[in-house]
Amino acid sequence: MSFDAVKKIEELKKSDITGYELVKAEVLKDMNSAGLILRHKKSGARVVVISNDDNNKVFSIGFKTPPFDDTGMQHIIEHSTLCGSRKYPVKDPFVELCKGSLNTFLNAMTYPDKTVYPVASCNDTDFKNIMDVYM
């Protein structure tokens, strides 16, 4: 059975997306996927949802991090961000996730103008747990 992107878009439009405004919805033919762009009403954050029949679930959060000088501060912040939190008070949750997770991808990357934190897993529970650590 093939993925029906048009049907999926209609389902997603009807779903409860409280706190978000639907900006755009379209069929992504090349990817056999349904695509949505949402805007979080309170923060203005843009959320992109791509839905298809792939078992691998992917999440990424990214921030503009333009450099002010050549000290590498953005890269230092990238690493500091993954050094534990009140909710996850371990020295290096990233290492713990690498050891005990079913992830298919787990990383953080600093580019010249942005920093991204992507994760992926085929296991629903693991995926939600990883997202919780990253958020």
Which residue stretches match the model-derived regions?
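M16/MPP (pitrilysin/insulinase) zinc-metallopeptidase core fold and M16-derived inactive scaffolds
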Residues: S51-V133
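N- or domain-start disorder-to-order transition segments that initiate the globular core
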Residues: S2-D54
